[in-house]
A protein has these predicted regions:
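Mid-protein regulatory/catalytic core that forms ligand/cofactor-binding pockets
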Residues: 24, 28, 52-108
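Short linear motifs at protein or domain termini
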Residues: 1-44, 128-140
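Residue-level recognition of short, well-ordered coil/turn positions
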Residues: 8, 49, 108-110
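Solvent-exposed, charged/polar functional surfaces in cytosolic regulatory/catalytic domains
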Residues: 40, 44, 61, 81, ...
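Short, hydrophobic secondary-structure boundary micro-motifs
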Residues: 12, 71-75, 112-114
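Helix-turn-helix/homeodomain-like alpha-helical modules used for DNA recognition
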Residues: 38-57
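Amphipathic, well-ordered alpha-helical segments in soluble domains
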Residues: 8-11, 33, 37, 54, ...
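C-terminal all-alpha effector/ligand-binding and dimerization domain
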Residues: 82-140
């Protein structure tokens, strides 16, 4: 039931299930939606707020400030399913990325969209790399 809720499996009319077809484009769209919600959350943070702790704690902190429950639930699903998978695949922790994005956003930097895109691409690459290792295929 949890995997179905997360969109990882699809229940068929005969009550059987099959794995969802998670293409690179689908994963890209999911991460873009998560990034959009996290950018919205960054703007909702109090000016003196800081993002501390490990990378996943920082993501979870952002989720708590979203005012609309549906947005919080969507972001929770994206964070706990896809982002957590990518973060756990890192060879070493990266705990400064979200605080840097927050700083750029607060400064009104024109580099914010490119910085978010770079972060999304990094997460996507981690997901695709691990997925290809499980499937026994190569990824670029």
């Amino acid at each position: 039931m949890i995997l179905e809720y997360q969109g990882l499996i699809i229940r068929l009319p005969n009550n059987r299930i099959k794995a969802a077809d998670l293409t690179e484009e689908t994963l890209r769209q999911i991460l873009a939606l998560g990034a959009q919600l996290e950018r919205q959350a960054m703007r909702a943070l109090p000016q003196d707020a800081m993002l501390a702790g490990g990378e996943m704690l920082q993501h979870r902190t952002l989720r708590t400030v979203l005012p609309y429950p549906l947005h919080r639930k969507l972001l929770e699903s994206i964070q706990e399913t896809y982002i957590a998978f990518a973060v756990s695949a890192r060879p070493a922790p990266v705990n400064d990325r979200l605080p840097r994005l927050l700083m750029l956003d607060r400064q009104g930097s024109p580099d914010v969209p490119d910085a978010w895109n770079t972060y999304e691409e990094e997460l996507l690459h981690l997901i695709l790399t691990i997925r290809s290792q499980y499937a026994g295929t190569e990824t670029h």
